[in-house]
């Protein structure tokens, strides 16, 4: 039997506030265990939560960027369950009145566009974490409560995705948006952006969803895709054998590429939500929403369209007329797009700048332990100066790449490197003509073959002249003189 895949995603994004959602403790990652705690996040008797206003603003940002409606009256609820890393015995979250509802994101997979619904976005606090002893024969686990009370947004999609590729496209777009908004650092390995996937199968043509399995806390796009693919195969095999899929929570094992049961439906929590009596409702006014809307950055989709638009100024900045591929690569990160725009502002040849940013700049960063563009020692101003030297003919494109590598290593300006290393391009016709004559004189056989119709040898002659000039000869002058002499 053929089956239709049904996928819904729950994404937890850890917010980049300096302090926690209900107390003033730091949210810095990697601190000594239990060093960023207080009576509130330790759940001590009598400690009362105080809401961090920035969390609400970040939630509004996320809602506006994902086409949600913003709930005007927000209530926090207690989600009751026991776990060693949850000191209060409950988690403060939102239940029936989430801050954002009824949104959507548009994705594209293999040229096909599709709208994925977003059911809700709600604010909540994170739990602590268990640290398991990595010692043979020791089964102890320790509790680190530094993460307890860290602010989260849970973004819940509709079950609208019908393939692993659609799920990944949605996740990557959401990941890009929260990073553009500056509300999450997007670090999957550190758990700043983590995902639970609900996967089920139904017969093709049916409109009744099958029994779903929930795949928990997967921390990379690669593993999310692997987990969903495995789960599809597992459920299909059960159904083909006449069995029934059990509703359960499953964990993905990246070492084996498989999922294993964590708990079944009968073990599922009854969270017994009720309004938190220690927190008053949060009222969000239209003025507040519009103030947040006015501070939103240009989002990836709009920036991509602007980068591809032809000429002139458009809403959000300048249009550059770039190919779709270039725009897609440059918009991948807000910082990379800004680096490109800052360089074009100083050297207004967008395609040339795009080629260099996607080529030499990205290559150098990748070779340097995948450094971020923010850490690039070649600033937009330095890159623009290098490109100006190339445009003026002071150096050739080949020499420019050599100069760039030196700039990256030393942070020096291109002009200084060119001067120190004597790399100024030779454009003197007389000097280049002497080199051309010498090359032709030394290679009479190749000259005869070229004149006999083997025109592919032209590149050989160019290479010989460039070698003789140590790469300094102006290629345009070399080509012109060679053509003139070989065809005379």
UniProtKB/Swiss-Prot annotation:
Tell me the superkingdom of the source: Bacteria
Q: What is the lineage of its organism?
A: Bacteria, Pseudomonadati, Thermodesulfobacteriota, Desulfuromonadia, Geobacterales
GO MF terms listed in the record are: asparaginyl-tRNA synthase (glutamine-hydrolyzing) activity; ATP binding; glutaminyl-tRNA synthase (glutamine-hydrolyzing) activity
- First-tier enzyme category under EC: ligase
Q: Can you name the source organism? A: Citrifermentans bemidjiense (strain ATCC BAA-1014 / DSM 16622 / JCM 12645 / Bem)
SMART domains reported in the protein's UniProt record: GatB_Yqey (SM00845)
Q: Name the UniProt key words of this record, in alphabetical order.
A: ATP-binding, Ligase, Nucleotide-binding, Protein biosynthesis
Which EC number applies? 6.3.5.-
Protein name as catalogued: Aspartyl/glutamyl-tRNA(Asn/Gln) amidotransferase subunit B
Q: Does the keyword Ligase apply?
A: yes
């Amino acid at each position: 039997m053929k089956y239709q895949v049904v996928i819904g995603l729950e994404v937890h994004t850890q917010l980049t506030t300096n302090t926690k959602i209900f107390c003033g403790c730091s949210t810095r990652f990697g601190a000594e265990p239990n060093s960023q705690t207080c009576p509130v996040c330790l759940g001590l008797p009598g400690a009362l939560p105080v809401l961090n206003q920035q969390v609400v603003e970040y939630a509004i940002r996320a809602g506006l960027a994902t086409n949600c409606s913003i709930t005007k009256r927000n209530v926090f609820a207690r989600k009751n369950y026991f776990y060693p890393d949850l000191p209060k015995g409950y988690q403060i979250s939102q239940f029936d009145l989430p801050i954002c509802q009824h949104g959507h994101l548009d994705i594209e997979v293999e040229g096909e566009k599709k709208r994925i619904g977003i059911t809700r976005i709600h604010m909540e606090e994170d739990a602590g974490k268990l640290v398991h002893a990595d010692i043979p024969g020791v089964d102890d686990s320790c509790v680190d409560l530094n993460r307890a009370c860290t602010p989260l947004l849970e973004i819940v999609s509709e079950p609208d995705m019908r393939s692993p590729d659609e799920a990944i496209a949605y996740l990557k777009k959401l990941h890009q948006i929260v990073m553009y908004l500056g509300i999450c650092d997007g670090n999957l390995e550190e758990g700043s952006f983590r995902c639970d996937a609900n996967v089920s199968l139904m017969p093709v043509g049916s409109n009744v969803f099958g029994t779903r399995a929930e795949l928990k806390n997967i921390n990379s796009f690669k593993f999310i895709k692997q987990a969903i693919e495995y789960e599809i195969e597992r459920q299909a095999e059960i159904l083909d054998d006449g069995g029934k899929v059990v509703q359960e929570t499953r964990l993905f094992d990246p070492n084996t590429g498989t999922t294993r049961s964590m708990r079944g439906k009968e073990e599922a929590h009854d969270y017994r939500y009720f309004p938190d009596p220690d927190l008053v409702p949060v009222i969000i006014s239209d003025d507040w929403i519009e103030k947040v809307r006015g501070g939103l950055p240009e989002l990836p989709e709009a920036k991509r369209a602007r980068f591809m638009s032809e000429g002139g100024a458009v809403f959000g900045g300048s249009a550059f007329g770039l190919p779709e591929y270039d725009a897609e690569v440059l918009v991948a990160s807000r910082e990379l797009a800004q680096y490109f725009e800052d360089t074009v502002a100083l050297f207004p040849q967008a395609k040339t700048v795009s080629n260099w940013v996607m080529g030499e700049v990205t290559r150098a960063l990748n070779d340097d332990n995948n450094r971020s563009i923010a850490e690039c020692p070649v600033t937009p101003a330095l890159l623009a100066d290098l490109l100006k030297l190339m445009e003026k003919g002071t150096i050739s494109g080949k020499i420019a790449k050599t100069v760039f590598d030196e700039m990256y290593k030393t942070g020096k300006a291109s002009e200084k490197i060119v001067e120190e290393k004597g790399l100024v391009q030779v454009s003197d016709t007389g000097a280049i003509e002497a080199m051309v004559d010498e090359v032709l004189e030394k290679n009479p056989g190749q000259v005869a073959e070229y004149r006999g119709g083997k025109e592919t040898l032209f590149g050989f002659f160019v290479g010989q002249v460039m070698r003789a000039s140590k790469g300094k000869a102006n290629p345009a002058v070399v080509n012109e003189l060679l053509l003139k002499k070989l065809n005379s």
